[in-house]
A protein has these predicted regions:
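Active-site-adjacent structural elements that line small-molecule/cofactor binding pockets in enzymes
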Residues: 1-269
Protein backbone atom coordinates (compact mmCIF):
# COMPACT_ATOMS: atom_id res chain seq x y z
CA UNK A 1 0.00 0.00 0.00
CA UNK A 2 1.31 3.46 -0.90
CA UNK A 3 0.99 5.71 2.13
CA UNK A 4 0.58 9.49 1.89
CA UNK A 5 3.59 11.60 2.73
CA UNK A 6 3.94 13.23 6.12
CA UNK A 7 6.78 15.21 7.62
CA UNK A 8 8.02 15.53 11.19
CA UNK A 9 10.40 18.02 12.77
CA UNK A 10 12.80 17.33 15.64
CA UNK A 11 12.62 20.59 17.59
CA UNK A 12 14.97 20.65 20.59
CA UNK A 13 14.97 23.71 22.81
CA UNK A 14 18.10 25.59 21.70
CA UNK A 15 17.02 29.18 22.32
CA UNK A 16 14.87 31.23 24.66
CA UNK A 17 11.35 29.93 25.03
CA UNK A 18 9.74 32.75 23.06
CA UNK A 19 11.90 31.97 20.02
CA UNK A 20 11.24 28.25 20.38
CA UNK A 21 7.47 28.79 20.47
CA UNK A 22 7.67 31.08 17.44
CA UNK A 23 9.59 28.37 15.59
CA UNK A 24 6.90 25.83 16.45
CA UNK A 25 4.20 28.13 15.12
CA UNK A 26 6.10 28.42 11.82
CA UNK A 27 6.46 24.64 11.65
CA UNK A 28 2.70 24.30 12.10
CA UNK A 29 1.98 26.97 9.48
CA UNK A 30 4.21 25.17 6.96
CA UNK A 31 2.06 22.03 7.22
CA UNK A 32 4.40 19.64 9.01
CA UNK A 33 2.49 16.83 10.71
CA UNK A 34 4.46 16.27 13.90
CA UNK A 35 6.69 18.06 16.41
CA UNK A 36 9.24 15.68 17.91
CA UNK A 37 11.74 15.99 20.76
CA UNK A 38 14.77 13.91 21.77
CA UNK A 39 15.22 12.04 25.05
CA UNK A 40 18.51 13.44 26.36
CA UNK A 41 18.51 14.06 30.13
CA UNK A 42 20.11 17.32 31.31
CA UNK A 43 20.88 18.46 27.75
CA UNK A 44 17.18 19.08 27.07
CA UNK A 45 13.97 19.50 29.10
CA UNK A 46 12.11 16.27 29.79
CA UNK A 47 10.02 15.06 26.84
CA UNK A 48 6.56 15.04 28.43
CA UNK A 49 6.29 18.68 29.56
CA UNK A 50 8.07 19.85 26.40
CA UNK A 51 5.58 18.03 24.19
CA UNK A 52 2.62 19.18 26.27
CA UNK A 53 3.75 22.77 25.72
CA UNK A 54 4.30 22.14 21.99
CA UNK A 55 0.79 20.73 21.66
CA UNK A 56 -0.76 23.62 23.58
CA UNK A 57 1.09 26.06 21.32
CA UNK A 58 0.27 24.45 17.96
CA UNK A 59 -2.37 21.72 18.27
CA UNK A 60 -0.07 19.53 16.14
CA UNK A 61 0.71 15.89 16.61
CA UNK A 62 3.66 15.47 18.97
CA UNK A 63 6.05 12.63 19.69
CA UNK A 64 9.31 11.42 21.17
CA UNK A 65 12.23 10.85 18.80
CA UNK A 66 12.91 8.61 20.62
CA UNK A 67 12.56 7.44 24.22
CA UNK A 68 15.65 5.52 25.35
CA UNK A 69 14.19 2.46 27.08
CA UNK A 70 17.01 2.04 29.67
CA UNK A 71 16.54 5.52 31.15
CA UNK A 72 13.32 4.77 33.01
CA UNK A 73 11.23 1.78 34.08
CA UNK A 74 8.92 0.43 31.40
CA UNK A 75 5.80 1.31 33.41
CA UNK A 76 7.00 4.91 33.78
CA UNK A 77 7.56 5.30 30.03
CA UNK A 78 4.15 3.78 29.36
CA UNK A 79 2.39 5.98 31.91
CA UNK A 80 3.99 9.12 30.48
CA UNK A 81 3.10 8.10 26.92
CA UNK A 82 -0.48 7.20 27.79
CA UNK A 83 -0.88 10.47 29.68
CA UNK A 84 0.31 12.43 26.65
CA UNK A 85 -2.16 10.54 24.44
CA UNK A 86 -4.99 11.43 26.79
CA UNK A 87 -3.99 15.07 27.21
CA UNK A 88 -3.49 15.61 23.46
CA UNK A 89 -6.71 13.75 22.60
CA UNK A 90 -4.87 11.08 20.64
CA UNK A 91 -2.26 13.29 18.97
CA UNK A 92 0.83 11.74 20.58
CA UNK A 93 3.05 9.05 19.09
CA UNK A 94 5.59 7.19 21.20
CA UNK A 95 8.96 6.81 19.56
CA UNK A 96 11.12 4.32 21.46
CA UNK A 97 14.39 2.45 21.06
CA UNK A 98 17.15 0.85 23.09
CA UNK A 99 19.28 3.99 23.39
CA UNK A 100 22.01 5.73 21.46
CA UNK A 101 25.56 4.33 21.19
CA UNK A 102 27.49 4.81 24.42
CA UNK A 103 24.41 4.99 26.62
CA UNK A 104 26.04 2.49 29.00
CA UNK A 105 28.31 5.23 30.38
CA UNK A 106 25.34 7.53 30.89
CA UNK A 107 23.46 4.81 32.75
CA UNK A 108 26.43 4.20 35.06
CA UNK A 109 26.77 7.93 35.75
CA UNK A 110 23.10 8.06 36.76
CA UNK A 111 23.26 4.93 38.90
CA UNK A 112 20.90 3.07 36.58
CA UNK A 113 21.15 -0.63 35.70
CA UNK A 114 23.26 -1.41 32.64
CA UNK A 115 21.34 -4.12 30.84
CA UNK A 116 22.52 -6.17 27.89
CA UNK A 117 21.29 -5.21 24.41
CA UNK A 118 18.75 -8.03 24.69
CA UNK A 119 17.65 -6.70 28.07
CA UNK A 120 17.24 -3.19 26.71
CA UNK A 121 15.15 -4.57 23.87
CA UNK A 122 13.01 -6.41 26.39
CA UNK A 123 12.49 -3.04 28.07
CA UNK A 124 10.99 -1.76 24.82
CA UNK A 125 8.66 -4.74 24.67
CA UNK A 126 7.61 -4.21 28.29
CA UNK A 127 6.96 -0.49 27.75
CA UNK A 128 4.75 -1.12 24.73
CA UNK A 129 2.86 -3.88 26.56
CA UNK A 130 2.26 -1.58 29.53
CA UNK A 131 1.14 1.20 27.20
CA UNK A 132 -1.38 -1.06 25.49
CA UNK A 133 -2.76 -2.06 28.89
CA UNK A 134 -3.12 1.57 29.96
CA UNK A 135 -4.68 2.58 26.63
CA UNK A 136 -7.32 -0.11 26.92
CA UNK A 137 -9.83 -0.79 24.14
CA UNK A 138 -10.70 2.83 23.37
CA UNK A 139 -7.25 4.37 22.73
CA UNK A 140 -4.32 3.31 20.58
CA UNK A 141 -1.12 5.30 21.04
CA UNK A 142 0.95 4.85 17.86
CA UNK A 143 4.39 3.35 18.50
CA UNK A 144 7.39 4.33 16.39
CA UNK A 145 10.26 1.94 16.97
CA UNK A 146 13.89 2.71 16.13
CA UNK A 147 15.61 -0.52 15.09
CA UNK A 148 18.71 -1.92 13.46
CA UNK A 149 19.52 -5.55 14.24
CA UNK A 150 17.36 -8.56 13.39
CA UNK A 151 15.97 -8.98 16.92
CA UNK A 152 14.87 -5.35 17.07
CA UNK A 153 13.32 -5.60 13.62
CA UNK A 154 11.45 -8.75 14.67
CA UNK A 155 10.05 -7.00 17.75
CA UNK A 156 9.01 -4.00 15.67
CA UNK A 157 7.06 -6.30 13.40
CA UNK A 158 5.14 -7.45 16.49
CA UNK A 159 4.47 -4.16 18.26
CA UNK A 160 5.22 -1.07 16.15
CA UNK A 161 2.96 1.04 13.95
CA UNK A 162 5.95 2.81 12.38
CA UNK A 163 9.54 1.65 11.94
CA UNK A 164 12.65 3.80 11.56
CA UNK A 165 16.13 2.36 11.10
CA UNK A 166 19.02 3.45 13.30
CA UNK A 167 21.44 3.85 10.44
CA UNK A 168 25.14 4.63 10.39
CA UNK A 169 26.58 7.50 8.38
CA UNK A 170 28.36 4.95 6.20
CA UNK A 171 25.22 2.94 5.39
CA UNK A 172 24.49 3.04 1.68
CA UNK A 173 21.11 3.33 0.02
CA UNK A 174 21.28 -0.35 -0.91
CA UNK A 175 21.96 -1.49 2.66
CA UNK A 176 19.03 0.46 4.10
CA UNK A 177 16.80 -0.59 1.22
CA UNK A 178 17.44 -4.24 2.04
CA UNK A 179 16.47 -3.69 5.69
CA UNK A 180 13.31 -1.84 4.65
CA UNK A 181 12.26 -4.47 2.14
CA UNK A 182 12.81 -7.18 4.72
CA UNK A 183 10.41 -5.46 7.11
CA UNK A 184 7.79 -4.67 4.48
CA UNK A 185 7.86 -8.24 3.22
CA UNK A 186 6.61 -9.34 6.63
CA UNK A 187 4.13 -6.57 7.42
CA UNK A 188 2.77 -3.38 5.87
CA UNK A 189 4.03 -0.86 8.42
CA UNK A 190 4.75 2.84 7.96
CA UNK A 191 8.44 3.51 7.31
CA UNK A 192 9.96 6.67 8.75
CA UNK A 193 13.29 8.07 7.60
CA UNK A 194 15.55 9.95 10.01
CA UNK A 195 17.27 12.66 7.92
CA UNK A 196 19.80 14.59 10.02
CA UNK A 197 21.58 16.22 7.07
CA UNK A 198 20.10 18.67 4.56
CA UNK A 199 22.65 20.03 2.12
CA UNK A 200 25.75 20.60 4.25
CA UNK A 201 23.84 21.27 7.47
CA UNK A 202 23.62 18.82 10.38
CA UNK A 203 20.59 18.95 12.69
CA UNK A 204 21.31 19.20 16.44
CA UNK A 205 20.36 16.10 18.43
CA UNK A 206 19.87 14.09 15.24
CA UNK A 207 23.57 13.54 14.52
CA UNK A 208 26.89 14.75 15.87
CA UNK A 209 28.17 17.64 13.77
CA UNK A 210 31.75 16.77 14.75
CA UNK A 211 31.38 13.19 13.51
CA UNK A 212 29.21 13.82 10.45
CA UNK A 213 30.68 14.51 7.01
CA UNK A 214 27.87 15.46 4.61
CA UNK A 215 30.11 15.16 1.56
CA UNK A 216 31.19 11.64 2.53
CA UNK A 217 27.57 10.67 3.18
CA UNK A 218 26.56 11.89 -0.27
CA UNK A 219 29.46 9.91 -1.73
CA UNK A 220 28.15 6.79 0.05
CA UNK A 221 24.65 7.51 -1.32
CA UNK A 222 23.36 7.71 2.24
CA UNK A 223 19.62 8.07 2.80
CA UNK A 224 20.36 10.25 5.83
CA UNK A 225 20.92 13.21 3.49
CA UNK A 226 18.51 15.31 1.44
CA UNK A 227 19.42 18.02 -1.07
CA UNK A 228 19.04 21.61 0.13
CA UNK A 229 17.32 22.53 -3.13
CA UNK A 230 13.57 21.99 -2.61
CA UNK A 231 12.92 20.81 -6.17
CA UNK A 232 15.69 18.23 -5.93
CA UNK A 233 14.45 17.21 -2.49
CA UNK A 234 10.92 16.62 -3.82
CA UNK A 235 12.29 14.39 -6.57
CA UNK A 236 14.46 12.43 -4.14
CA UNK A 237 11.68 11.97 -1.58
CA UNK A 238 9.32 10.69 -4.25
CA UNK A 239 12.02 8.28 -5.40
CA UNK A 240 12.48 6.96 -1.86
CA UNK A 241 8.79 6.20 -1.50
CA UNK A 242 8.53 4.59 -4.92
CA UNK A 243 11.68 2.46 -4.63
CA UNK A 244 11.78 1.71 -0.89
CA UNK A 245 8.45 2.59 0.71
CA UNK A 246 9.35 5.58 2.89
CA UNK A 247 6.44 7.95 3.48
CA UNK A 248 7.28 9.65 6.80
CA UNK A 249 10.32 11.95 6.67
CA UNK A 250 11.82 13.47 9.82
CA UNK A 251 14.17 16.45 9.60
CA UNK A 252 15.67 18.95 12.04
CA UNK A 253 13.90 22.17 12.94
CA UNK A 254 16.84 24.16 11.54
CA UNK A 255 15.70 23.08 8.07
CA UNK A 256 11.94 23.47 8.53
CA UNK A 257 11.73 26.82 6.72
CA UNK A 258 14.03 25.67 3.90
CA UNK A 259 12.01 22.50 3.33
CA UNK A 260 8.60 24.21 3.62
CA UNK A 261 8.04 24.16 -0.19
CA UNK A 262 8.67 20.40 -0.13
CA UNK A 263 6.03 19.91 2.56
CA UNK A 264 3.58 22.12 0.67
CA UNK A 265 4.10 20.06 -2.48
CA UNK A 266 4.02 16.56 -1.00
CA UNK A 267 2.21 16.46 2.34
CA UNK A 268 -0.85 14.22 2.22
CA UNK A 269 -0.18 13.10 -1.35
Amino acid sequence: MTRPFRFGVVAPVLSDMRSWRERLRRVAAHGYSTVLVPDVPQWQPAPAPTLALAFAETGMRVGTWVYASPLRPAWSTAWEAHSLSVLTEGRFEMGIGTGRPGIEDELRDRGLPVRSPAGRLEGVRDAVAALRELDGPDLHTPVVMAVRGPRARALALEVADTVTFSTLASDSREEVTQMARGVLAERDVELALHVPVVGDGVAPFMASAADTDPAAMREADSLAVLPADPLAAVEEIERRREEIGYSYFVIGADFADLMAPVVAELSGR
